[in-house]
Each structure stands twice: as structure tokens, then as C-alpha cells.
Amino acid sequence: MGAATSALNRRQLDKFEHIRLRPTGKKKYQIKHLIWAGKEMERFGLHERLLESEEGCKKIIEVLYPLEPTGSEGLKSLFNLVCVLFCVHKDKEVKDTEEAVAIVRQCCHLVEKERNAERNTTETSSGQKKNDKGVTVPPGGSQNFPAQQQGNAWIHVPLSPRTLNAWVKAVEEKKFGAEIVPMFQALSEGCTPYDINQMLNVLGDHQGALQIVKEIINEEAAQWDIAHPPPAGPLPAGQLRDPRGSDIAGTTSTVQEQLEWIYTANPRVDVGAIYRRWIILGLQKCVKMYNPVSVLDIRQGPKEAFKDYVDRFYKAIRAEQASGEVKQWMTESLLIQNANPDCKVILKGLGMHPTLEEMLTACQGVGGPSYKAKVMAEMMQNMQSQNMMQQGGQRGRPRPPVKCYNCGKFGHMQRQCPEPRKMRCLKCGKPGHLAKDCRGQVNFFRVWPVDGSETQKFSRRYSWGGANCAPSTESIRPCKEAPAAICRQGEAVEGTKEKTTSSESRLDRGIFFELPLWRRPIKTVYIEGVPIRALLDTGADDTIIKEADLQLSGTWKPKIIGGIGGGLNVKEYSDREVRLEDKILRGTILIGSTPINIIGRNILAPAGAKLVMGQLSEQIPITPVKLKEGARGPFLKQWPLSKEKIKALQEICDQLEKEGKISKIGGENAYNTPVFCIKKKDKSQWRMLVDFRELNKATQDFFEVQLGIPHPSGFEKMTEITVLDIGDAYYSIPLDPEFRKYTAFTIPSVNNQGPGTRYQFNCLPQGWKGSPTIFQNTAASILEEIKKELKPLTIVQYMDDLWVGSQEDEYTHDRLVEQLRMKLSAWGLETPDKKVQKKPPYEWMGYKLWPHKWQISSIELEDKEEWTVNDIQRLVGKLNWAAQLYPGLRTKNLCKLIRGKKNLLETVTWTEEAEAEYAENKEILKTEQEGTYYKPGRPIRAAVQKLEGGQWSYQFKQEGQVLKVGKYTKQKNTHTNEFRVLAGLVQKLCKESLVIWGELPVLELPIEREVWEQWWADYWQVSWIPDWEFVSTPPLVKLWYTLTKEPIPKEDVYYVDGACNRNSREGKAGYITQYGKQRVEKLENTTNQQAELMAIKMALEDSGPNVNIVTDSQYAMGILTAQPTQSDSPLIEQIIALMVQKHQIYLQWVPADKGIGGNEEIDKLVSQGMRKILFLEKIEEAQEEHERYHNNWRNLADTYGLPQIVAKEIVAMCPKCQIKGEPVHGQVDASPGVWQMDCTHLEGKVIIVAVHVASGFIEAEVIPRETGKETAKFLLKILSRWPITQLHTDNGPNFTSQEVAAMCWWGKIEHTTGVPYNPQSQGSIESMNKQLKEIIGKIRDDCQYTETAVLMACHIHNFKRKGGIGGLTPAERLINMITTQLELQHLQTKIQKILNFRVYYREGRDPVWKGPGQLIWKGEGAVVIKGGVELKEYPRRKAKIIKDYEPRKRMGDESNLEGAGGADN
């Protein structure tokens, strides 16, 4: 509140609160209006202190008055409020806002200023007629006149409020979208830097974006100063100086100087245009940041409508900062490339460079029927989440009765208080001073002696946090002593003396009381025998008691203690007895006017009080974690455990609590997760496991910081190596305190002899999804700092495993490793001695490491009589792991054994090929293999070898020694080419080399240069591969056929085709040659694609060594031009074998049904009896329909079942429909109740038109006069026929009339008018006016009267033209929207009723009823419920449905904690 509330004194505030907002209203001004005004000042670059004086208010009025006529409601309210404040400061008696505004207009001479402005405008307009030079208009034709020439002088004309208002509206609506840059260019054309700064200053709510623009301005200004250094020496008298960067930005230059630089300087420097370019650069950067999605990332979803994808694509294109040529290339290549597979198949069939209209037309059905189901599913999900939020909001406790802040009585608010206004402190609540002068704060005190001697300081200790959550502050629970490193017991602090009542004191035995923090830690202490209720404050240095609670005798010294709120005079009594629990201590007591009694550290420290937390380093940063949006924590019951496991869990938890890694909690935490334990590998110890599956579902998603395991072949060769392991890695990193409550778990008691012991984690727990990522990130940041200090060491980290190498001798290396361990220990990361490996071989991540070589840990293949799917999976996994060092391993036939099998325990029958492959692999593994380390600067060579069965093997070598090996299998394609597989293998090699060594290898491939280049010349676009060296290795044999690019002369041409009847599955295939040779065969149980391929096979069989083949099948063309060498299709294999035998083959595709000679003849031969044409008889009817209604081709195609090309041809033959092409119909995103209305003129008559924005449905008629009465009648007609909730019109007098306003009030219609400088405001109605006139022009000859033509045109537009969303007519679309809305409302009602029920359910054979869950759906035999974030299905017999009548309260709600409601609790 600050200065805003101090703008008026008490007397002025009383007068201010008696002024009414409106002359006839009851509401009056309140303090909240002053607070709001203070915050609004920042938007206009004004200080809120200006509200405190009459002169300040006058300055504010001068700024706001030009903007008030066209300003927003908020700006007008601020202007009115400042006028009222001006009158209050001036002691003018006013009753309401209107009187204040009238007084301000007279006092500030605003009326005279308006008259002078009108007079100047009149003189300027008359001067323009007389003076040819007149006003300098910017070249873009903008009406923002920056200056006017009067004689030889230039006078600045500021921007109009309308221009500023349009700029503010544009920014508020577009939010720095791609449209904001052209909008700024249009509005700022010809402006001076002063005008541009004024445009930036009105954007008060976008400080982040303005800061980006400011940084760009500073950079460009610095570049300008470097490129234009100032001249040496002083300037001659009268010469205008050159502008600097700050001058161009308008910070160090006046408006007159800017005008002189622009218009009169020699040479002229257009500082306004230069500054505009700088601002545009900044705005473009803002647009990029506010629209972070790149056009490369715009991809069509599987069920997304193609039109929606196009809209997103072009929106991203507009935000891209690229040239027009680049954007054109992006549109042509990416729009089709990033479409979903369904649309991509359709778009590729359109040929090269299809138009956008053709693409939208072809793909308009994608996402249609299923899109509605998707919307309904999302709505259902939203309703569920809203219902959960509403139910959650009802769990809070009831609000207390209202209390007056002025008099302190209950039952009324401050604004209703009849007593005089009291000036009261907002912090302590006492009268007589303001909050800024308050001295009664409880803060971190520090002693300031009166005599000015040196300040006393108390010793500082580590702050730790231990277990809390006892049910009462008076309950005492013994706890083990904190670690000795934290605080030494019995150590006194600054003159305090400690005395124990007995040797059996709990504090002397190393046990102290624990206090919960769910309420204030207040205890009863005895000071000189007087019981005092005091707050135990570890943050306060001193003990201070209220004068009313304690009166001490004896000598005292005056002191001043300082806090944030100021100094406080106290009395200091030294050496006073204080008894806290069983401890009797002597120390210093301060007596003063404190709001609450405080026991500080001078008493708590000698008493042995400590804040105990786990052994988690306070230096380690805490990573904030939260739940997913709308998710809640786990509420799972603990399942039964055996006595042995309960005892083991209790021992583990006692140790973890002693180390501070977990903390005890009480029943106020409502969350719980089941816990259990298992025996470790050595069977001597237990391991605690917590089932965090439910919490993992609700926790936010994380990204794995480390994406793979470091490979030993990528390590450099080191003379010394050490392998470390961080013990209890997760337990070393603290967990976000706000998230700890969700990790709560319970250890039950045997036979339920007592309540279970509850804990929560203070560190990262095992099994939680966030632990790996947080640990990786935290450990990496710690090691980064250590690496800078221990530069001789090379440290490689993967999770908690560390590989440390160096080139030092053994002694130095061990010393550096010990330093590393000490530094890790200082951060709280321990490295146990038993996990430190100092001698080779080192076991690390499944490898065996030596300083000069590495191996894979021994792998043994089992011999079993019976193998299951799970056994085969484990076997293949072992072989894949071994393949990185053992060359020649194969798994293709082993994988075939489990293809299609899903049950892991299903028995597998071995094939002969798999047994041979298994035996070969066993022989390979018998020979021990080893790899070497990487030598920087030496080239890496990759040798590729082809194995049997389409499998490949490769080796990475360096100086003849093997770094690593691997294997590769062909992709899962039906038709493959080994050269394409080889290209994929090379890509894999290069990617693997870049990941491990960061460089590309020299490739040795089994292929000849000429053979590869012959294939690569035509198929280079299939993938990217690097350059390689062709070496003398066994070449890949050429087993593919040759396709020529030009027809083979003097050879016969075979036109092939095939056809199939879809019902009978019978077909024909054949060919016809240019010399008349032909052959046609009948086929059974075939398809169109198979028939096309069979025709090609027949042509190959009957032709010579050279052949020309022409087909109209893109399917066959696509397969054969890829030159496959093997295929899973027998027919393709036969065609490949025939083509390999040919010397030359020319294969060409032509479009079908285009009248091409041989193709048309063979098509007739194979189509006879197969294909039928059913639409010919409908063409004549369609032509008659179009001559009457002139409907578009979509309507003709749907109504009469015509192909699109036939329907388009009918429209093209009509002379009246060839004025312009067919428009692409698109609809804006609007609700079903939004209409736009406008008046247009035709043949001297007024036509009023209304359009339903979402559907394009129009209502129109001729009205006698353009008046409010006629407009209201027409509006009533629409209201009586269609649902209308919002009406948008322009600012015409008939639309803003009282008749229309009354009709909108009666019909509950929201009426909005057009926005200046916003071309989209009335876009729908303007487009419909144009279309309506075009239709009328086509049918005007058929009717006598204009009124008839208008109604006929409405009928044609609404019922005879299809397009837009769903390919429907506007009438169909409107009815569909209304029906859909009714269905959704009905569905919402059903969902709401269902969600009011709760379900208790049983799972499997578990007799315990669980729940309650939320009922989502109920059928005859099953129900679907929601438990947590999962949807589950249960049989009806295992579910009980009840109605939830009353919301339940949980102890974990924050509203149940004392102190959560404020200081009064």
C-alpha cells in the first residue's frame, strides 16, 4: 500500500470516503481505490507520490486528459479518481465524480485548451488549401503527421490519442504475435523518436518485452557510435551537431533537434526511420520469444484436421524471421513433409506443387468423425477436473465473522463503522503511528550498548532440522543426541552459566525434548521462579520479556536493541536464573515492550537446544519439485508385514532417522505409501523398498540429464586408474521441503498393539522417478567445481559410479584421489572404502578395466532342455551386449523364435537355423577378446563386413588395434535394397563414432567405387552419409537391374494395366504394344495392385533383353524404381529375377484416364466387366440444378454423386460463375451464439445483413430506412428464430441507437462495436456482403424485385453451397452446431450426476474393500472408476456405489494447522 494510502491525511480521507462514485448511486470511494490508483501510475511512467499533492494531481491530469476521450474504462476511471483527489486537496466541496470532473475542467483551463486545439485545427486545414507545400505526409500514406511547416520552421505535432489507443489495443490482443511488427510499422510511419518513445511508454504491463527492446536499442546505439565517431574539435557557431546513438533513441535530444536532423540538416539524417528499424529488430526478437515454436516443429497430429494444421503452419511461418524466398521454400517443402501419413498419401497424389485450395479440398475429411469424439472426451476430462477442484474447495473451514479494523468490534466492516477514523499501524495494530514508523517488530535482535562500545556477538552454529509433528507442544519425546560435529554438549555461550538439577537430568543424559513446528514452539519457562509463556526462537540472539509479564528487581542497564523496524529501548538484567525443562541456567534477560515473549539463543544454546537435520550438506542446492497439474499425492494403506520384516524396517528407519535422512511425522500428514523390505544378495542384511508407483504417476515429468553409459573405448589411455562408488547416493541429496510430505510411509506394529510409526524422507528416496535426474544434475554440478581444482585427474561419472584416471605416478595419483574423496565428503557425498577399487581389474558398469585394455565381464550361455520367451529375450540381450567386443555374433534367427509371442513363460520350439546360430555364437564367445583405449589425434577406421542372412558386422580400429565392434541388421521393410541398408549402416557408424569419440571415422566398405556411385547418383536423396574411402575389400556383388532414363529406341513399347472387381475379387491383367501385340489373362482372388504387378510380369516374360514398359500404377512404379534386391512378396521376387536378366529396361508412369494412346486401349481391355461408371445419368440433372441456383461444385458432387472433376467442369462451363474463382471457405473460431450485423446498399436500397460467425449462415432483407427502429425489428426477427448471445456491429447511428440497446437488453444480448485499426473486427459480415452481392448478380435476371433477389440469394448461400468446416452448407453447419451444443449440455448433466457418486471396490481375491473412487461410467456388468490419476474397470459384483452427501476433511489440510489463518490464531 505504501504511498497510495498516505496520499490523504485523516481529515481528507474522511471527506474522500463521503464522495459518491455516481450522482444517483449509493457506492462511495474507499481506500482500495487509492491503492489501485497507486499501482496504475506505473503504466504511464508516473510516480505514485504525485497523488499526495494538488500540483501532482494536476500533472497527472495533464497527461491523462488527451487520452481520456478514446481511452479504456480503466483509464477513464483513473482520470475521474485523480479529479476527485484534486478537489479533496484543493478543499473543494464535491458530492460525486461528475462535480469533481467539472471543477477540474474549469480550474485547469481544460475547456480553453480544447477550444484552442479546435481553432488550431481549423487554421491548419485552411492553411493546407492555401499552401501547396502544406503538411509533409510520410511516404507510406499514413496520417500520423510528425511535423508541420510554418514558414521556414518545422513544428512538431504529437501522436493522436486514437493512434496510441489502437497501438495499445493491438498489443493487448495480439500479445506480441507475428502481427505486431506490421502493426507497429503502420502506426509509427513518419514518427520522430519522441513519438516512438511515447508509443513504448504506454505499454506498462509488458516490462519483460520492453526490456528486450531496450537491450536491442543499446546494442544498436553502440554500433552507431562506433560507425559514426564525433568530429575532432569544437563545432562552428550555428552548425547542427551530428546525432549520437542516444540522440537517435530520444534520450539526449529534444524534439526540435530531431525535426532539424530529419528535415533541415545537410546531409539529412532520418533519425525517426533509424530508430524505427531498431525497435522493429527488438519487436522481432520479442515475437520469436513469445512464439517459440519453430515452423520445423509444426507437425500434423494423427487425428488433427488438415485445415487446423495449415492454420498453425502459416502462423509459425509469419513469426519466422526469414526472407520471402526462404518462406516460399519452407511452404512448398515442409507443408506436405510434416503432414500426417493419411494426408501425406493424399497430397502426394496431387502431383508437384499443388495449390493450397487443392490440398485443403483433398484433405478435408481427415479428422472428421473422430474429431467430435475427441472434443467430447476432452470436455469430459475437464468436467472431472473441475468437479474435483470444486469438491476440494469445500474442505476448508468456515470463515470467521467479519471484524472492523477501525474499532475492533465484530459484525461490520471498516467502511460501515460509525466511529471516527483512527490512524492505526498496519503491522502491530496499535494507534498513534504508521507502519513505516513501527518499532514493535519481532526480528533478529542485536544488542547496541548505549555507551557506544563494541557490539556483542553470539557464536553461530549450524542450523539443522530434525523430526517434528508431535500432537501437542507440551508433549516431550526423547530423541537421540545430535552428531557431535554439530554442537558440543555443555558448551556455554557468552557469560551464561549452566547448572543441572540432578545427575539424572534428561539433558545431561544426551536426550532433549522435541517440539513440533505445526504450531508455534511456545513453552513455559521459569525466570526467577515466575512462570512465563515464551516463544523458543533460534533466530533471536537475546531473551526479551514483556514488562507486563515480568518485574525484576535489582540493578539494570539501559540498552537499545536493533531490528528491521527500528531501535527499541530495553532494560538489561544480568545473571538471572532461568529454568527450562530440567535445566537451570543463568543468563541475561531483557525487559521491554515486545509483542511476544522470546527465549533467544543466549539461553537455548547452554540448555543444549539444537536444530537437528540429516547429514545433508547445506551447500547442496535444493531442486524444486511439484506434482502434475490437477494430481494429488498417494493415499494408499500399508499392507500387512511379518514380525521379522517389521523389526528389520524399524532398525533401518532408526538408523536413517539418526542420520537425518528421514523424519518422524504424525497423523496430520494425510499421505501414505506402502513400504516393505527384502533380503540383500548376501542374505545377511535387509533392504527397505517403498512402493512409489502411485507417487510416480502424480509427480511432474523429468528429463534424463545423462542419455547413455560412457563407453570404455572412448576413454584415453591412463597410467593410473581408480574406480569409486558414492555410497547411499540418493540419500546424500536433500529433497524439496515442500515435496517431502508426499513421501510419507508407515511401519505398522505387530498385532496392531499400537499406532504405526510414520516417517517422511528428507532426501531423495529410492524408487522415486525424480531421484535419478536430480542426483545426476546435482552430482555433475559438484564434480564440475572439483574438476577445476583437481585438473590432473580425469573424472567420468555415471550416476553414483566414478572412473578416475591420471597420467601421474601411483603415489601422486592416490593422493589426488584422497583429495577428491575429501572434497566429495565435504559436500556430503561419501565414498566407502569397501567400494574403492585401486588395483586392476576394475569392475565398472559391466566391464573389466586395465590401464592398457578393457574387456567385457565373462558371459556364459546356458544349456537348457526347455526355453521360454523370457529365456530367449535374456539370451538375445547377452549377445547384443557381447557384440560390442566379439565380432560375428548374430541374433536374427533367435529373434524369429519369439516373433509374435507375448507370454513370457510360453515354451519356445527351436528351429535348425536358430540352433546353428546359437552354436556359432557359443564358439565365438569361447575366444577371449579385448579392446584398447582411444588415442587422441590418431585416425579411426571402421571396417564393415557382410554376414549371412542380411546381417552386417563392423569394427572400429586405431593403429590396427580394436576399439570396439558391433553388428547391424536390415530394417523391417518388405522390399529392401542392400545399398540402402549399407547407407543406413554408415549412418549408424558415424552417429556412434560422433557420440563416443566426437569425430567421423575413415570407412572401409565392401563395395567398388564405380558400383556405389552408379547407384548413389540416382538415389542420393534417400539419406545423409559422409564421404568415405573405397578400399580393396571384397566388393558387394551387383545383383540389381538397370533402369535407363530415356526410352530405348527401336524397341517395342509395352502398355500394361490391371483391374479388379472389389466384390468378386476377380481381375484381369495384360499388355498391348505399339505394334499391336497384346495379351490379357484373367485372375482370381486378387487386388488392383497385384493385377498391376502381374501385368508388368507378363510384359517382362514376353519381351526381349531390352524393353520399354509404360504403367499407370504409382504403387508398382514406386516399388520397382527403388531397385530392390530382395522381397518378402513372391510376386515381387519373380519380377526382380526377370528384370535382372534384362540388359536394359525403361520404366515410365503416365496418369490414368487421360486419353493416352496405348494406355487407354489396354485400360479398355482389362476394365471390360470390371469397372462401372454410375454417374453419367446424373450429369444432366446437375447441370439443370446449377443453371437455376448457381451452387458450387462441392454441393453438386455430394448431391448427385459426381466425381470432383465432373462437378468442377459443370461450374466452369457456366458463364456467370467465371467472374472469379471459387473462394476457400474458412471459419473463425467463435461460439455458436455470436452474430455480426451490417447494412449494405444495392440499387439505391438498404439491405440489412446478419451472419452467424461460426457457420456462415446469413439472414438478409431490404429495409425502407437505415434507422434504429428498423434495425431493432430485424434483430427481433433473428432473436425469434436462432439463439443469439452476442451481436457485433460497427459504430453506425442505427446500431448504437436506444431501440437496438433496448432490444439487446430484453434479449440478453451482449452488444459490441468495431475496434479502430482492426481489420478483423467486422471481417465476417464484410465478406458475406460481398458474396451476397455476387450471388444476386448471377440471379438478378430471374427476378423482378430487389427484395425477391435478396431472399433468393440467401437461400442459395445457405442451402446450395458446401465448403468450409466439415464440407457442409451454412444451414447444415448451423443446425449441427446447435444440436451438438444441446448434446454436450445433456452429456454434462449426466456426467455431473455420475460424478456425485463414490465407489468402494475389491481387487482380485483381496477381501479388503478399497476406495472410495470416483464413478466415471456404470454399465450392466462393470463400472469404470477413477482412483488417483488412473481409470480402472471392475466387475459390478466387486463394487459398491454410494452417494457422496458431504465433503470430508483431512488432517493434512493446511487450514487445520494452527497459525495458518493469520496472527490471531
Curated annotation (Swiss-Prot):
Motif position, Nuclear localization signal: 26-32
Modes of activity regulation: The viral protease is inhibited by many synthetic protease inhibitors (PIs), such as amprenavir, atazanavir, indinavir, loprinavir, nelfinavir, ritonavir and saquinavir. RT can be inhibited either by nucleoside RT inhibitors (NRTIs) or by non nucleoside RT inhibitors (NNRTIs). NRTIs act as chain terminators, whereas NNRTIs inhibit DNA polymerization by binding a small hydrophobic pocket near the RT active site and inducing an allosteric change in this region.
Spans annotated as Disordered: 116-144
RNase H type-1 domain boundaries: 1048-1171
Signal peptide feature range: none
Single Gene Ontology MF annotation: zinc ion binding
UniProt-annotated site: Essential for RT p66/p51 heterodimerization, residues: W1015, W1028
Location of the Integrase catalytic domain: 1228-1378
Binding-site list for Zn(2+): H1186, H1190, C1214, C1217
Lipidation (N-myristoyl glycine): G2
Positions bound to Mg(2+) 2: D1057, E1092, D1112, D1163
Motif (Tryptophan repeat motif): 1012-1028
Region (RT 'primer grip'): 842-850
Domain Reverse transcriptase: 659-849
DNA-binding region(s) from the entry: 1397-1444
Gene Ontology CC terms: host cell; host cell cytoplasm; host cell nucleus; host cell plasma membrane; membrane; viral nucleocapsid
Binding site for Mg(2+) 1: D725, D800, D801
Peptidase A2 domain boundaries: 532-603
Domain of life: Viruses
Active site: residue positions: D537 (for protease activity)
Note: The reverse transcriptase is an error-prone enzyme that lacks a proof-reading function. High mutations rate is a direct consequence of this characteristic. RT also displays frequent template switching leading to high recombination rate. Recombination mostly occurs between homologous regions of the two copackaged RNA genomes. If these two RNA molecules derive from different viral strains, reverse transcription will give rise to highly recombinated proviral DNAs.
Job of this protein: Gag-Pol polyprotein and Gag polyprotein may regulate their own translation, by the binding genomic RNA in the 5'-UTR. At low concentration, Gag-Pol and Gag would promote translation, whereas at high concentration, the polyproteins encapsidate genomic RNA and then shut off translation. Matrix protein p17 has two main functions: in infected cell, it targets Gag and Gag-pol polyproteins to the plasma membrane via a multipartite membrane-binding signal, that includes its myristointegration complex. The myristoylation signal and the NLS exert conflicting influences its subcellular localization. The key regulation of these motifs might be phosphorylation of a portion of MA molecules on the C-terminal tyrosine at the time of virus maturation, by virion-associated cellular tyrosine kinase. Implicated in the release from host cell mediated by Vpu.
Name the UniProt record assigns to this protein: Gag-Pol polyprotein
Organism: Simian immunodeficiency virus agm.vervet (isolate AGM3) (SIV-agm.ver)
Gene name of the record: gag-pol
